[in-house]
């Protein structure tokens, strides 16, 4: 479910919990941190997994939990240690972005040597890695 609706979920009824969060403008949604903080006691009683989706992970040296800056920051801020972690690269869908978002993302891609053609969509997700993560979690 969306993070906005997750606060209504009774976590006690589940044996496994998976939380995923994407990066927008260099940050995870603050509600993800709030959710973890409020539910930390319950999360620590369960088998849990966390994954982050960010385009930085398109680079081989930043596509693992221990090398991805956003994962490292999430773990530091949240003070939560899920049983399983994963990092996925996601995609850039320039045509679907608003003008300002497209410019900002294009600039970020330019300075990080990523794709900058705003007429294109770029898929960086390693779907085999996603499927493997799902198998390991479930």
PLM feature spans:
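Short amphipathic alpha-helix with an adjacent loop that forms part of the alpha/beta core around
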Residues: 7-13
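A short beta-strand-loop structural module common to alpha/beta enzyme folds
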Residues: 1-7, 54
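FMN-binding flavodoxin-like domain, especially the glycine-rich phosphate-binding loop
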Residues: 14-16, 21-138
